[in-house]
Regions:
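N-terminal binding-site loop/beta-alpha segment at the start of enzyme catalytic domains
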Residues: 1-78
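Conserved, mostly hydrophobic/aromatic
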Residues: 17, 39, 47, 62, ...
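Short, acidic/polar
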Residues: 26-39, 98-116, 137, 162-165
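Beta/alpha (TIM)-barrel catalytic core signal, keyed to glycine-rich beta->alpha loops juxtaposed to Asp/Glu
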Residues: 129-271
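Acidic (Asp/Glu)-rich catalytic clusters
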Residues: 7-11, 41, 65-78, 113-117, ...
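Active-site groove signature of glycoside hydrolases
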Residues: 113-132
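N-terminal small/glycine-rich loop or linker at the start of catalytic domains
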Residues: 6-24, 80-96, 120, 125
Length: 271
């Protein structure tokens, strides 16, 4: 397994185990622990969470069934989580919205730590830009969270270059990661300055949905069909699975991107 060193105290595996489907996959606590152990055997020590995954249930299951049952695993893994998205009904709201004021981020951080059964996460990301938010307030929250040791490092997710640089200008600590969509089908971040800005600042890039959300495998739109034909040819020539080619597309980029997997199946993870 290859790793990305983002600071003197943060090194993440280039393959990150995404935990968005922890609950939806219908696996038991024992199966989840088996999955975590298999990840570690493969060198995958980084796990991606968010409060909105299963409306908190995914973090809760990971905390209850992994870290409470086997506390020693905490020192072997890196936990990434996020904050800043309010789901419908959480605060009397009908629609999802993004909110990154100081008090909201502090409360979300505490709630995630409680669900995950840990006293800190290794990396906290602002999940989505809050276009009506005050970046100074967001920065104050991140500084306090790091100062209190609740998150060892911070970053963002889905930030445009100007949004990234604006928030960074209010911080005395670096934003170490920008998590973004990157795949053979979703290449827009190569052309809008997001990837270039990350490389300029030596910011880690964590690619979500590197398999295109599955649409390349089954989609009937022209782009999906064309990509599927080309990827199948390459996969056959190389003697590998098509998803391996899709991961390779992201991993070969000079930015040394990380990819977030979506499977909870240890066998698929190995492939």
């Amino acid at each position: 397994m290859q790793y990305v060193t983002l600071s003197d105290s943060l090194r993440l595996s280039r393959v990150v185990a995404g935990c968005m489907r922890t609950v939806g996959a219908g696996i038991s606590g024992e199966e989840l622990r088996t999955f975590v152990h298999r990840c570690l055997e493969l060198g995958i020590d980084s796990f991606d969470h968010a409060p909105v995954y299963g409306a908190g249930a995914c973090e809760q299951m990971f905390g209850d069934e992994v870290l409470k049952v086997e506390p020693s695993l905490r020192d072997q893994i890196k936990i990434v989580t996020k904050a800043g998205i309010i789901l419908p009904g959480q605060r009397g709201n009908r629609h999802i919205y993004y909110a990154s004021p100081k008090e909201n981020l502090l409360k979300e951080m505490d709630a995630s730590l409680k669900r995950l059964s840990t006293d800190h996460v290794d990396l906290l990301l602002i999940h989505r830009p809050d276009v009506l938010g005050d970046p100074e307030q967001t920065a104050m929250a991140l500084e306090q969270i790091v100062r209190e040791g609740k998150a060892l490092h911070v970053g963002v997710s889905n930030y445009e270059p100007s949004q990234f640089e604006t928030l960074q200008s209010y911080l005395s600590i670096p934003l170490l990661v920008n998590q973004m969509e990157v795949s053979v089908k979703a290449t827009y971040n190569f052309f809008n300055g997001v990837v270039d800005t990350a490389m300029k600042h030596k910011t880690g890039i964590m690619a979500w949905s590197p398999l295109g959300g599955g649409s390349v495998f089954a989609g009937q739109d022209e782009q999906s069909v064309r990509l599927r034909e080309t990827l199948s040819e390459i996969a056959e020539a190389k003697g590998v699975a098509m998803d391996t080619v899709m991961y390779a597309f992201v991993l070969r980029h000079p930015a040394k991107m990380m990819v977030i997997t979506g499977t909870m199946n240890p066998q698929r993870l190995q492939n």
